[in-house]
Amino acid sequence: MLHGYLSNKESFAPQIEYFSKFYRVTAPDFPGMGGANALGCPFSVSDYADWTERFLEEQGIKNPLVIAHSFGGRVAVKLLARGRVDKAVLTGCAGIVRKRTLRYKMKVRAYRIVKKLAPKYAEKHFGSAEYRTLSPVMRESYKKIVNEDLREEAKTIERPVLFVCGTEDRETPLSSAQIYHACVKDSRLLVLEKCGHFAHIENPLAFNAAAEEFFS
């Protein structure tokens, strides 16, 4: 199980409890997150995928069934494209860069101007609250991650994938899941009503049942 950005394996508590009845469940914390060691240098999505491959090899795991959320979905897309995964359930899967609005572009331009004149002010008042809490290394990693669009890699995936999206998800909206679904030829799309970005936690019964059926 591959967790979301700045999250940890505990975010999969309902899935770990449920699937441990049927499978050997492994849920690592990504480097720089949860209880893992801090990053020594900025990681890209590919770097995290490389790390995950090494982790799987160390654990003696081949062709795993994967459940991934948000950022973990980015890593899973890389692994799927490399043929390292048997099947995957990706919920709230990130990796589709949305078209930038005029407002966003103006905000970026303003940030660049203010950063030159008053860097401390820019750091305090621009960017998401999440971004402002990151260490310098994690900030550089974050930039690498969020600016990479994974559509082309998704098109190369030949393994079965179930995409799950909540109707109220604002972080990775249904439109992103639909794009992924169109890119991956052997894929399904499950939409969970009245769920947001954490559909696997908000409706674990429906999510677990769908994942179990998909994996069987």
Residue spans of the language-model regions?
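Active-site loop/oxyanion-hole signature of alpha/beta-hydrolase fold enzymes
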Residues: 13, 26-67, 209
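Flexible "cap/lid" loop of the alpha/beta hydrolase fold
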Residues: 74-117
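Conserved alpha/beta-hydrolase catalytic His-Asp/Glu region
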Residues: 100-159
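Short beta-strand/loop motif that positions the catalytic acidic residue
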Residues: 156-157, 163-165, 169
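Conserved alpha/beta-hydrolase "acid-adjacent" motif
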Residues: 170-176
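Catalytic histidine neighborhood in serine/cysteine hydrolases
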Residues: 181-198
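Conserved HGGG/HGGXW glycine-rich cap/lid loop of the alpha/beta-hydrolase fold
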Residues: 1-35
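Catalytic histidine-centered segment of alpha/beta-hydrolase-like enzymes
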Residues: 195-208
